[in-house]
């Protein structure tokens, strides 16, 4: 059973430049939306993996990482920890701020839908047209996330080092499994397991509401799979998300 610790930011590999995870979440450098075959290199410049699917456009993710744009006027997040009562959110490289005029909190699930005072034009809304089972690795061939807050880098020994500052970072997540009640779980805290991809990213305390995106190899599109709810501790491996449909 996962503990009720809200996720915040992420734990990532200490063997890959930290800037790589920041560039990934902000679509900077080689991480241009639509580009395929992006080679990931470690601190010594050695190739450690390749991102084979078209790079996602993360512009739908708010600068704080806890809200994702679903249309030009609405965004989705978790409900707990005050996320169901947000007043504003910012998007884009210019960090333009938008006022939330209505918060709609789901009565039974831990997620919330927010309406903005005006249309947001500098960000591309996420798709939520999920078909089939997210656990079907033949259809959903990649999972990416982004979030912001307290950061850690993790060595193979398990030692974690805190990185000061607040940054939007992102990375890869292994194929999730269903855990009941519209929930899915994954194990991106198993940082050096190849099943988590070359840029494994594990949400930490405060990252609640941050998105998980799934790449559908049949439709060749990225969709919002769910938003982060909890993890099983700073040194844990698993996290839990609510599926957005």
Where are these regions (language model features)?
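Sec-dependent N-terminal signal peptides
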Residues: 1-3
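C-terminal subregion of chymotrypsin/trypsin-like serine protease catalytic domains
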Residues: 5-47, 57, 63-82, 167-197, ...
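Short, solvent-exposed loop/turn elements at domain surfaces
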Residues: 30, 78, 84-87, 123, ...
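Cell wall/extracellular polymer interaction/catalysis modules
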Residues: 59-61, 101-102, 112-116
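Catalytic-histidine neighborhood of serine endopeptidases
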Residues: 71-72, 76-109
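Short conserved beta-strand and strand-loop elements enriched in small hydrophobics
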Residues: 83-96, 139-148, 214
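Chymotrypsin/trypsin-fold serine protease catalytic domain
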Residues: 108-206, 228-233
């Amino acid at each position: 059973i996962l503990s009720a610790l809200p996720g915040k930011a992420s734990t990532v590999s200490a063997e890959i430049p930290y800037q790589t995870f920041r560039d990934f979440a902000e679509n900077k450098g080689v991480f241009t939306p639509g580009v395929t075959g992006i080679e990931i290199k470690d601190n010594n410049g050695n190739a450690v993996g390749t991102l084979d699917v078209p790079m996602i456009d993360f512009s739908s993710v708010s600068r704080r990482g806890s809200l994702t744009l679903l249309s030009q006027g609405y965004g989705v997040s978790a409900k707990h920890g005050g996320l169901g009562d947000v007043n504003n959110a910012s998007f884009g490289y210019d960090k333009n701020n938008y006022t939330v005029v209505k918060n709609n909190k789901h009565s039974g699930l831990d997620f919330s839908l927010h309406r903005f005072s005006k249309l947001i034009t500098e960000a591309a809304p996420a798709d939520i047209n999920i078909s089939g089972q997210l656990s079907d690795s033949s259809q959903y061939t990649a999972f990416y996330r982004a979030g912001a807050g307290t950061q850690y880098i993790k060595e193979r020994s398990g030692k974690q080092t805190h990185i000061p500052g607040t940054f939007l970072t992102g990375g890869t997540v292994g194929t999730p499994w269903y855990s009941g009640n519209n929930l899915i779980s994954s194990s991106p805290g198993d940082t050096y397991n190849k099943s988590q991809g070359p840029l494994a990213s594990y949400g930490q305390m405060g990252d609640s509401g941050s998105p998980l995106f799934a790449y559908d190899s049949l439709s060749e599109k990225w969709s919002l799979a769910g938003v982060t709810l909890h993890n099983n501790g700073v040194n844990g491996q698993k996290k839990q998300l609510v599926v957005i449909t």
